[in-house]
């Protein structure tokens, strides 16, 4: 048995000095042959990675970011790369860990949904992976409720039975005699993005903005963790919450041993990249809390990390002979303003009222103007202790969306190493 760890970054993150929490986690992972259990590790920087740090390439990366968030541009390549890695490395009994930030968080949720629907084909059939993804997306467009798992699934000894003649994904799984692994752990920072899918029932506008199948609920996931940003307000960065509660099925085709899925979604102070990382290191103290929380949760689920690297990257302990320094977590860390001028313009574009979260926004003719709409945090949500300490020590920090009733999540405890 081994761990297979997939790390998918947000659009525009790359291996440089201003690194995201996904890349910091990747660097903390034990990857040597001596690691017990062995860990096979995959990292994808995401769409829009900067090849050159000049104005043109930054503009191009930002354009790809908007396009990717709005339409899912580039998602297929990211999903197929990670899926192919799993195809070649998975063996029965292995534990699959999926991590992602931003658009990369949605990527791993799509990957988990794809595995639930078509399974994991054998290595000698990897050339068919693209066809499987097409079938999965067609199923998503013909079955809108599948995004939230609101579908019934039946099977026989050869695999899943197609729901109808349009369920090409189930037919694909039967033809390829696929494997059916479960997903041991999904850990995401601030999932955003949607996908435009074709709709045969739309005559004038032949597409709609939808969730791909099993990206909001997925019974093949055992443990789900999400770190969410309290202070993000950009309309293009709406949080994709996970349905809670839902069930986990050990056997894809048998409900007999189903059990409640282990789910926790925790809110942290800051905007999107204050939670997922990626700002200059000297301004990244807030992002260390969601990083440490995720590392602790994943370690409890069996992930193996190097404690000295965790101490350096997450706790800010200077490592001997290292030319790099990293900040420690601080409740007084910089909280960035992500609403730059370019993003601000998009706040005045009308959106369908079905996406409205904040009650103070007025609806006219089925639409509303987001205009820095706060994220809705429900009563009973999990709020990290660092948020409450920041409120207590900083009089100017008063998030308007903090619920009246919530559960506290304690601060991390520094270990040895």
What are these regions (language model features)?
Residues 1-417:
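Active-site- or binding-pocket-proximal scaffold segments within functional domains
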């Amino acid at each position: 048995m081994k761990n297979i760890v997939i790390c998918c970054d947000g659009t525009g993150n790359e291996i440089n000095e201003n690194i995201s929490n996904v890349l910091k986690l990747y660097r903390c992972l034990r990857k040597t042959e001596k690691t017990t259990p062995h860990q096979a590790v995959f990292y994808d920087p995401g769409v829009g990675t900067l090849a050159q740090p000049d104005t043109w390439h930054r503009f191009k990366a930002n354009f790809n970011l908007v396009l990717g968030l709005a339409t899912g541009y580039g998602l297929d390549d990211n999903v197929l790369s990670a899926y192919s890695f799993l195809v070649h490395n998975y063996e029965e009994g292995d534990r699959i860990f999926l991590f992602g930030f931003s658009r990369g968080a949605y990527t791993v949720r799509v990957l988990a949904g794809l595995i639930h629907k078509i399974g994991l084909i054998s290595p000698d059939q990897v050339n068919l992976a693209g066809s499987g993804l097409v079938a999965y997306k067609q199923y998503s467009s013909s079955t809108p409720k599948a995004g939230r798992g609101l579908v019934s699934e039946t099977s026989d000894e050869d695999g899943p039975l197609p729901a109808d003649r349009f369920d090409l994904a189930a037919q694909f799984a039967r033809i390829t005699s696929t494997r059916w692994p479960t997903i041991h752990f999904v850990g995401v920072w601030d999932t955003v993005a949607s996908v435009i899918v074709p709709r045969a029932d739309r005559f004038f506008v032949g597409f709609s903005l939808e969730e791909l199948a099993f990206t909001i609920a997925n019974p093949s996931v055992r443990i789900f963790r999400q770190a969410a940003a309290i202070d993000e307000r950009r309309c293009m960065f709406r949080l994709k919450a996970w349905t809670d509660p839902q069930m986990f099925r050990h056997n894809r085709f048998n409900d007999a041993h189903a059990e409640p899925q282990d789910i926790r979604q925790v809110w942290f102070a800051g905007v999107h990249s204050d939670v997922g990382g990626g700002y200059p290191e000297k301004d990244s103290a807030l992002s260390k809390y969601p990083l440490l929380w995720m590392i602790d949760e994943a370690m409890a689920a069996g992930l193996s990390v190097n404690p000295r690297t965790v101490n350096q990257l997450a706790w800010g302990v200077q490592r001997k002979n290292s030319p790099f320094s990293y900040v420690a977590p601080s409740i007084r860390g910089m909280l960035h303003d992500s609403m730059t001028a370019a993003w601000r313009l998009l706040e005045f574009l009308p959106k369908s009222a079905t996406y409205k979260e904040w009650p103070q926004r007025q609806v006219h003719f089925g639409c509303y103007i987001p205009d820095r709409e706060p994220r809705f945090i429900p009563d009973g949500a999990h709020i990290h202790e660092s948020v409450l300490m920041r409120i207590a020590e900083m009089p100017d920090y008063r998030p308007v969306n903090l619920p009246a009733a919530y559960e506290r999540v304690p601060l991390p405890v520094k270990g040895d190493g």
